Amino acid sequence: MIVRDILEQIVAGQDLSRKETETVFAAIMAGAWTPAQIGALLMGLRMKGQRVEELVGATQALRACMTRVEVSTDHLLDTCGTGGDALSTFNISTVSAVVAAAGGARVAKHGNRSMVSRSGSADVLEAAGLRMDMSPAEVADSIERIGIGFLFAPAHHGAMRYAVGPRKELAIRSLFNLMGPLSNPAGAPHQVLGVYAERWLIPMAEAARELGSRHVLVVHGHDGLDEISLSGPSDIAELKDGMISRSRIQPEDFGLSSAPLATLQIDSVAAALAAAEEVLQNRPGPRRDVVLLNAGAALYAADVVPDMAVGVVVARAVLKSGAAWDKWQALLGRTSQG
């Protein structure tokens, strides 16, 4: 496959097939494309408009060369989203993952350091004391023994290194932002997947279906949050039993009060860690409430509860009982829970 021909095809506004995209991204991850060529491809795809078939093909290439974590996928959940909302909230999906684990989900939390916000999942977990150099076997043991483990993206997606430079220099969202959440190294088939733009709700659900996911909630808040929002409505595209449906929810649907986005924002990793721990210690307020929403959705996506409303009830209970705090301590290796 000649690089020039692929770029000419994209410049002409012609979509790549799933197989063509898989071949292109496999070549990129093998180091066969130069940084300039990778940058041209990413910009060309963005300008043309990125299609589901292209996203699926690229993700298949990424999955083919990732370092896997071998665990049972029963009720195995991820809460990794696209990121890129640039709203600098505390780590809602990470805290929600811990609460979901305390509520009975098995969690393979996939994540990375922050690109545009104040604190990514890896940033806050590392600040809390979690090692980022855990082997796949150690991560698998954490999932099986504790019920939650963290999969640090660079440790499992080494082939992505060839695209790091072009992505940083372009400094725009690209297909890679969408591929990452669809490439859980443990193969988690259950997911709450936040997206940075409403237009990606259905395409991401369609891609997840093509890639074999079981139950996925693709979510986007009207305030731009790539989580279920507390400041107003959130849209959801749900993949379940092979079917995709759309819905809109509000905090009041679950007995919670709306609150301004500013109540969830932080300005440093230290502030993000403090926010996470105050929620896990069940301190009332908007931060706890937004976690109740997202953890409730996570428990539903994991098929631990019959609907999101019950999930919110369970999330509230594990925070109140201290089970969520205990799960956090176990994840960090401070207790021997198992």
UniProtKB/Swiss-Prot annotation:
Binding site for anthranilate 2: R167
InterPro entries for this protein: Anthranilate_Pribosyl_Tfrase, Glycosyl_Trfase_fam3, Glycosyl_Trfase_fam3_N_dom, Glycosyl_Trfase_fam3_N_dom_sf, Nuc_phospho_transferase
Binding note for cofactor: Binds 2 magnesium ions per monomer.
Binding sites annotated in the UniProt record for 5-phospho-alpha-D-ribose 1-diphosphate: 81, 84-85, 89, 91-94, 109-117, 121
Coiled coil: none
Pathway: Amino-acid biosynthesis; L-tryptophan biosynthesis; L-tryptophan from chorismate: step 2/5
Chain positions recorded as anthranilate 1 binding sites: G81, N112
GO molecular function: anthranilate phosphoribosyltransferase activity; magnesium ion binding
Cofactor: Mg(2+)
EC number: 2.4.2.18
GO cellular component terms, A-Z: cytosol
UniProt keyword terms in alphabetical order: Amino-acid biosynthesis, Aromatic amino acid biosynthesis, Glycosyltransferase, Magnesium, Metal-binding, Transferase, Tryptophan biosynthesis
Gene3D superfamilies, A to Z: Nucleoside phosphorylase/phosphoribosyltransferase catalytic domain (3.40.1030.10), Transferase, Pyrimidine Nucleoside Phosphorylase, Chain C (1.20.970.10)
Function of the protein: Catalyzes the transfer of the phosphoribosyl group of 5-phosphorylribose-1-pyrophosphate (PRPP) to anthranilate to yield N-(5'-phosphoribosyl)-anthranilate (PRA).
NCBIfam families for the chain: trpD (TIGR01245)
Oligomer status and interactors: Homodimer.
Family statement: Belongs to the anthranilate phosphoribosyltransferase family.
PANTHER family registered for this protein in UniProt: ANTHRANILATE PHOSPHORIBOSYLTRANSFERASE (PTHR43285:SF2)
Record's protein name: Anthranilate phosphoribosyltransferase
Gene name of the record: trpD
